[in-house]
Amino acid sequence: MSNQGEYPEDNRVGKHEPHDLSLTRRDLIKVSAATAATAVVYPHSTLAASVPAATPAPEIMPLTLKVNGKTEQLEVDTRTTLLDTLRENLHLIGTKKGCDHGQCGACTVLVNGRRLNACLTLAVMHQGAEITTIEGLGSPDNLHPMQAAFIKHDGFQCGYCTSGQICSSVAVLKEIQDGIPSHVTVDLVSAPETTADEIRERMSGNICRCGAYANILAAIEDAAGEIKS
């Protein structure tokens, strides 16, 4: 008996017939060959596109600096930081490389009288500048008042950060003397005073991992009185 009457929906207009999924052997060979060719060609083209270009040759530039009172004529790679120029070219290794990211202050030097993290600036940006490093502040026979104060108050332990601490301290007293306010300066009209809060705020960019901060503060306060007198 026919079931056509029981399932009239099978005769609806527009009902799709099943697709013919049969595949001849010839068609299978064609598809396999095309797939294999794609697998061979595509990785090679991707590899060729990913090969980096040759690194350009470094650009060398003449540079004149006045470092610790002495004029230096240099030829430096334009990508070289001031820190590396001081240490590698001029062998002034008193300036330390700490974090190399401008976060610790160990590389602080004075550039035209203002403190600067030498690891964050390119040497060629300071053509003709006057640079003072820890070696230029004083000598063993004639210490700068700040150097003498750090020794007197034991403002260090391992000593790695000390050159940056001292250079920054000298600049801090100069900033206060020049009337430059800080974030903790209460009266912006009057000249800032050399208070403990002012010193702590201004020295906050110089990290001492040994924790000699109390002695560093005492040294700066002592040197401030010595320099004023």
From Swiss-Prot:
Q: Which residues bind [2Fe-2S] cluster 1?
A: C99, C104, G105, C107, C119
Provenance organism:
Escherichia coli (strain K12)
What the record notes about the co-factor is: Binds 2 [2Fe-2S] clusters.
- What is seen without this gene? Mutation results in complete impairment of cell growth in the presence of cinnamaldehyde.
What is the purpose of this protein? Answer: Oxidizes aldehydes to the corresponding carboxylic acids with a preference for aromatic aldehydes. It might play a role in the detoxification of aldehydes to avoid cell damage.
Q: What is this protein called?
A: Aldehyde oxidoreductase iron-sulfur-binding subunit PaoA
* Highest taxon of the lineage: Bacteria
Database matches in Gene3D superfamilies: 3.10.20.30, [2Fe-2S]-binding domain (1.10.150.120)
Sites binding [2Fe-2S] cluster 2 sit at C158, C161, C208, C210
**What's in the GO CC field?**
outer membrane-bounded periplasmic space; oxidoreductase complex; periplasmic space
| Sorted UniProt keywords | 2Fe-2S, Iron, Iron-sulfur, Metal-binding, Oxidoreductase, Periplasm, Signal
A Pfam family this chain is assigned to: Fer2
Q: Which InterPro entries match?
A: 2Fe-2S-bd, 2Fe-2S-bd_dom_sf, 2Fe-2S_ferredoxin-like_sf, 2Fe-2S_ferredoxin-type, 2Fe2S_fd_BS, Aldehyde_Oxdr_Iron-Sulfur, Beta-grasp_dom_sf, TAT_signal
Give the activity regulation note. The complex requires PaoD for activity.
Q: What pairs make up the disulfide bonds?
A: none
